[in-house]
Amino acid sequence: MAMKKLLIASLLLSSATVYGADGFVVKDIHFEGLQRVAVGAALLSMPIRVGDTATDEDIGNTIRALFATGNFEDVRVLRDGDSVVVQVKERPTIASITFSGNKAVKEEMLKQNLDAQGVRVGEALDRTTISNIEKGLEDFYYSAGKYSTTVKAVVTPLPRNRVDLKLVFTEGVSAKIQQINIVGNHAFTTDELISRFQLRDEVPWWNVVGDRKYQKQKLAGDLETLRSFYLDRGYARFNIDSTQVSLTPDKKGIYITLNITEGAQYKLSGTVVNGNMAGHSAEIEQLAKVHPGELYNGAKVTKMENDIKQLLGRYGYAYPRVATQQEINDADKTVKLHISVDAGNRFYVRHVRFEGNDITKDSVLRREMRQMEGAWLGSNLVDQGKERLNRLGYFETVDTETQRVPGSPDQVDVVYKVKERNTGSINVGVGFGTESGVSFQFGIQQDNWLGTGNSVGFSGTKNDYQTYAELSMTDPYFTVDGVSLGGKIFYNDFSADDADLSDYDLRRYGVGTTLGFPISENHSLNFGLDYVHDDLTNMQPQVTMWRYLDSVGINPKVVTTNKADSDADFSADDFFLSMGWSYNNLDRGYFPTAGSRASLTGKVTVPGSDNEYYKITFDASHYIPLSESGNWVLMGRARAGYADGLGGKNVPFYDNFYAGGSNTVRGFRSNTIGPKAAYYKCNSGNTRYSDCPVDKSSDAVGGNAMAIASAELIMPTPFLSEKYANSVRTSLFVDGGTVWDTSWQNTSATRAAGIPDYSDPGNIRISSGIALQWMSPLGPLVFSYAQPVKKYDGDKSEQFQFNIGKTW
């Protein structure tokens, strides 16, 4: 029976008679200890095979090769006659990785760090590298300024040679910056330079961007900010010589010292443009033109390069190369720019494709395209298509990608990748005010009906004072040229008295249609025709109301003994011709971050109507991004309206302008801003209502003129994950507005009753507050809390409002 011998030991004691000078011929190879690793995989990693002559060098190489696979903790090679026996001890497999104590860093980031070290579930765990794993994670924390963090890896054995790897973190506190020193600055003070940093040694309470917690990445960003600051002001030789970061003994404080060389300011002496400009040299040279003697500016140079690339991109040169070299003359402190341009190949579009539109039909997206298939690639046209898709409001995100066609030197495919959002909604509106209590609204809206791009909606309100219903539909592409067609039918039964408005009941129904005509990429005109029937009953003697009735030829009686005798009933059938202009270049349809939207609309009664008047409204919004990410946005909105009678008739009081509420001036109850009703209180001695005394009230009656303005600072929602940034929006706002009646007559009777002059537009109401909008899976939710800052007698506050709905 053959004796197994440890080959390494045997070789040390070898003799030619046992192994031979050239080793032995391997007739078989056996493995002992394999569990997870397949025999075939182990054999492939070995340098020797059956039939080979094994030498001591081969055996050593075999051991090293098996260790190199990372699958084994121990390897031994034995000889059993002419057979090689390989004894191994496999490393355990990581069954799970868990974390404990990590509050400052998310698990996803820690897993990415481990993955970079080759530590992941399903892989073998090398126990000898545990300390390296711990140190790698600690270094990761150090880069975030948490120098007192410790990491302990706990390995728990499991059946079948598996282990659970648990990483326990003791984070401690973040190291705070005690002082930032800049050495070598002469043209600018240290405070002036540090004021542009994210990292600060002192952070005022109002600065929501500054941070005293040290982070390596933020320091790198601040260094780039410092470099750009100097380069943009002519310091072409500026250099950051060294950066020193010192840690206090308790690891809680950081001292940062930046050593810089400012150099002198340099001026531009001119530009030289050369290279392949694809026949657009005149346009490129115009973009590269500078004024000799102006200060060198690094930001302008970068913009110049980007402008040249964009110019060439509009002509189909998708991948141009533009590089700028500086010729610095230290003697006269000037810089000449040498701009090298290589337009490259001109590309044509083979296909325009869409991905991610599972509901919306391709034709709906394709009709928004300005880049045509078969034409040369125009980067501006591709961008216009992206903007138009965003503006539809059907998608959470829209991304574009230009893919080169394999085997073609001059063809590309343009791919629009969209992520659809829920465009249908069933909304229940809830409002709560200190005086109004709770009210409800209901609505169904589908902005992308069956993926056709058509809008279909039904809305209704049912409460103690109103029953309202409206059915509407709009086809934005009624014709292939983009002419839109819309229509609606509505019914409204309204008791103004129960709504704390002027006393009357209104039953109204009507139908209307609108045609819209695009006149440019962002401008459109629309024309409409509407029919409206109004029945007014239970009208009580009120100055504005009676003045209107008198203008249309109705002279209500003045009788005080019977309330019913003082009522007046009135019906009107009106036909309106409406006209409007609109402009829209917002970057997306919902939650915009840049651009403007404006509209000017008007309507006028046509012959055959019982009323004769016109009404004009203007509404404009503008968004200014304050950060590249679009998280910080300044929004301003202005609205104005005016109406006046024709042919000696007054504007119907029931079609007045109103303000107050969630869509106008938040913090005030809906429709309560502006003129209030003044009721006649006649007695038996009065024969004309104009002779009657009047009483003031808090019932809103509206006015024929309106002006409203809002300013909002849109900001990141605190404690919210970045992935929800496109569905949640928080803002601080200030609203202001007023409604007035230009035909109001401030008589002795109204003055005696203490009624203010309602023709004065200066009675402006102001409120401020905070708002949150959320496109939640359960539906759109809007929350606002506002406090009136400036109010007048009779105004009614409503601080808290929210809407909640269901989307599909």
Curated annotation (Swiss-Prot):
InterPro entries: Bac_surfAg_D15, BamA/TamA_POTRA, D15-like, OM_assembly_BamA, POTRA. Residues 24-91, 92-172, 175-263, 266-344, 347-421 form the POTRA domain. One of its GO terms (biological process) is protein insertion into membrane. Residues 1-20 form the signal peptide. It is found in: Cell outer membrane. Its main location: membrane. It comes from the Bacteria. Keywords: Cell outer membrane, Membrane, Repeat, Signal, Transmembrane, Transmembrane beta strand. Pfam families: Omp85, POTRA. GO terms for cellular component: Bam protein complex. Part of the outer membrane protein assembly complex, which is involved in assembly and insertion of beta-barrel proteins into the outer membrane. Constitutes, with BamD, the core component of the assembly machinery. Belongs to the BamA family. Part of the Bam complex, which is composed of the outer membrane protein BamA, and four lipoproteins BamB, BamC, BamD and BamE. NCBIfam families: OM_YaeT, PRK11067.1. This is Outer membrane protein assembly factor BamA.
